[in-house]
Structure formats: structure tokens, C-alpha cells
């Protein structure tokens, strides 16, 4: 409640006087349904902006991939089909190679930490913003660390992944699945349930919130192995021409509305973990905790994947090592005082 009040205060502090101008209705594309925390956060965020602008700004939301499938959301904002879009970096593999280093196995322990890392001004200016061509990035964020969920075979050890067809959430997790002996399969988020039901995949890497709430996998998932091994990164992008058309005072209002929200957004995602887990377990799924020995084996494989990815990107002339080291340093910094699923469940 206090965080919501604070966010409202920040927006209202930059409220603009009413002027005799037409209302500007902005289209916002979201690939997850209206029941999800982030979709609801965006709706409330828009309502605050509408109030702070004295009605000069309005927002029309298109949740549930109503405008286009998830992989197309970045381009919806880039081309102006949408004025704003919540997009998934992993939806277009290879397009954001440095940003996606945040998705490496065991990089961050919570959405709060991940969101704080990605919005560090120095990191963005030096490495990340240049990858987001053709849009104005309003906010970068992650979900809480994800797990592997399967339909038939429980995964209790690193060797249990061998031979299974597993949907990956990002290119880095594709490499993780392959290193564990599984077959990585690319499936858009909205098609996971269908592929799980048909047997096209044996399991999927996804966070509890996504599995239990956003994509309603209760009854389909039989086993959830709590690895908390990775986060998926997202962004809120705005069409630059739409932004440029706004009067200066409205541009300022938009800019200020997303400053200092990292903790609020991150904690909101982290809170989905318990809710999503309950939805799956209530529908019959078994939650599996790894032994310390098996957790260490998964982490060792993750280290090898990380080393290989950095070497691969450095070979392409990208500053992967410097980006990774900056992210890791920020992750350690923000771990002090933030929740981590590796230690706090």
C-alpha cells in the first residue's frame, strides 16, 4: 500500500495543468492476459498518468497478445502499430545479446535484484540501450527466478534432463538445456500449454507465476523442480515518434513515472512465486526441492554455459565479458537488502 501511494505521489508531483487540447489515447500491447500482475501494473500506471495529465493522456490496453504474438511486440512499438509494448527479449533470439546475459543461469536471485540491475544507469548507457534500436525504453525488468516443470518425468537430478524435450525461455537457457542433455525446443509463451498437452514438449522452463497464473498450466504440469536457476528479461518500449509528438510537459511526466519503480515492480513479480506455486500444487503438481549435491551439479553446468556464452559473444566482437562482470557486480550489490530465492523462500 505504501509503495502504491508513493508511486502515485511521484506521478502527481509532476502533474501538468489542464489545457484545451485533445486527449491523446495511446495503445499499449501486452502479451500476457489481464489477470497477470504486470498487465495490471501497467493499467494502474496508465491510470496514474491519465490523472496526473488532467486527462490529456489516456491508455487503451491490448492484453493477451491481442495485437500480435509475443515475439512481435518489440516491433509493434518500433513501427508504431502500438504506442507502447511490453516485450520479451528472448522472443527474438540474438537481437539483444548483451541484455540477455541477465538470463544466464544463476545470475540473479530475484526479480527485484534483476530489475535493479537492468535499470542501472551506467549499465544501460554503456551496454544495453544501444541494443534497443528504434524504440524509447521506458523500463527493463525480469520475472522471479524460474524452474523446470514437466508433465511425465520428475527431475530430481541433473541427469534426469537427458532425452527430454524442454521449452527454453531464452537463448541462454536453450544452451543450459542442451548442456544438461535435453533437447531445447523453441515455443512462444502463449503456445506452451498446447504443446505440453500434445506431447510436443515434455516440460518447460518458466517461473511459477507464469506457469500457475499467466498461462494456467494447473492440471497439465505434474512436477515442478525448484531450481530458481534463471530470470527472463522484458522491457516496456515506447514508439519514439509517439514520444516526440508529446508536448514537453507530457514527455517529462512519462519519464518521471518510471523512475524509482524498480523495487515495486520487482517485488510484485517476486510475490507471484507463492501464488503461482499454490495454483499448480492445488491442481495436483508435485513441487520438488533439489538436494544440495544436485543443486551444485546444476550450478556447475550453469558456469560452463556462462563461460561458453561469453566466449561466443566476445568472438563476435561484443563486450560480453565486461557486460557480464558489470551485471554480476550489480547483482551482488543489490543482493544486500533484497530478497533472494536462493536463500529466502
Label every model-predicted segment.
Residues 1-6:
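Bacterial N-terminal signal peptides that target proteins for export
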Residues 7-8, 18:
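Cleavable N-terminal signal peptides
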Residues 10, 21-114, 122-345:
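N-terminal secretory/targeting leader peptides
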Residues 14-20:
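Sec/Tat signal peptide C-region and signal peptidase I cleavage site
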Amino acid at each position: 500500500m505504501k509503495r502504491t501511494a508513493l508511486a502515485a505521489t511521484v506521478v502527481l508531483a509532476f502533474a501538468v495543468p489542464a489545457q484545451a487540447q485533445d486527449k491523446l489515447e495511446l495503445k499499449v500491447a501486452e502479451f500476457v492476459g489481464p489477470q497477470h500482475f504486470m498487465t495490471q501494473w501497467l493499467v494502474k500506471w496508465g491510470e496514474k498518468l491519465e490523472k496526473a495529465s488532467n486527462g490529456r493522456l489516456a491508455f487503451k490496453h491490448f492484453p493477451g497478445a491481442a495485437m500480435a504474438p509475443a515475439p512481435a511486440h518489440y516491433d509493434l512499438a518500433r513501427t508504431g502499430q502500438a504506442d507502447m509494448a511490453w516485450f520479451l527479449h528472448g522472443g527474438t533470439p540474438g537481437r539483444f545479446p548483451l541484455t540477455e546475459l541477465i538470463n544466464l543461469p544463476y545470475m540473479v536471485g530475484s526479480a527485484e535484484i534483476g530489475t535493479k540491475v537492468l535499470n542501472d544507469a551506467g549499465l544501460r548507457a554503456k551496454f544495453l540501450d544501444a541494443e534497443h534500436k528504434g524504440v524509447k525504453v521506458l523500463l527493463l525488468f525480469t520475472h522471479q527466478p524460474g524452474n523446470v516443470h514437466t508433465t511425465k518425468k520428475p527431475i530430481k537430478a541433473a541427469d534426469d534432463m537427458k532425452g527430454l524435450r524442454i521449452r527454453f525461455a531464452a537463448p541462454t537457457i536453450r544452451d543450459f538445456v542442451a548442456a544438461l542433455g535435453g533437447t531445447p525446443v523453441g515455443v512462444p509463451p502463449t503456445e506452451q500449454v498446447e504443446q505440453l498437452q500434445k506431447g510436443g514438449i515434455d516440460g518447460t522452463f518458466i517461473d511459477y507465476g507464469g506457469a500457475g497464473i499467466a498461462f494456467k498450466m494447473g492440471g497439465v504440469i505434474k512436477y515442478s523442480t525448484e531450481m530458481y536457476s534463471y530470470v527472463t528479461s522484458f522491457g516496456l518500449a515506447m514508439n519514439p515518434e509517439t514520444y516526440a509528438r508529446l508536448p514537453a510537459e507530457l514527455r517529462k511526466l512519462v519519464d518521471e513515472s518510471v523512475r524509482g519503480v524498480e523495487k515495486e515492480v520487482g517485488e510484485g513479480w517476486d510475490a507471484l512465486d507463492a501464488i503461482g506455486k499454490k495454483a499448480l500444487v492445488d491442481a495436483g503438481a508435485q513441487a520438488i526441492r533439489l538436494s544440495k549435491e544436485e543443486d551444485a551439479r546444476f550450478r556447475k553446468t550453469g558456469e560452463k554455459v556462462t563461460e561458453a556464452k561469453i566466449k561466443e559473444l566476445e568472438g563476435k566482437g561484443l563486450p560480453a565479458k565486461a557486460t557480464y562482470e558489470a551485471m554480476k557486480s550489480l547483482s551482488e550489490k543489490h543482493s544486500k537488502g533484497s530478497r533472494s530465492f536462493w536463500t529466502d523462500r
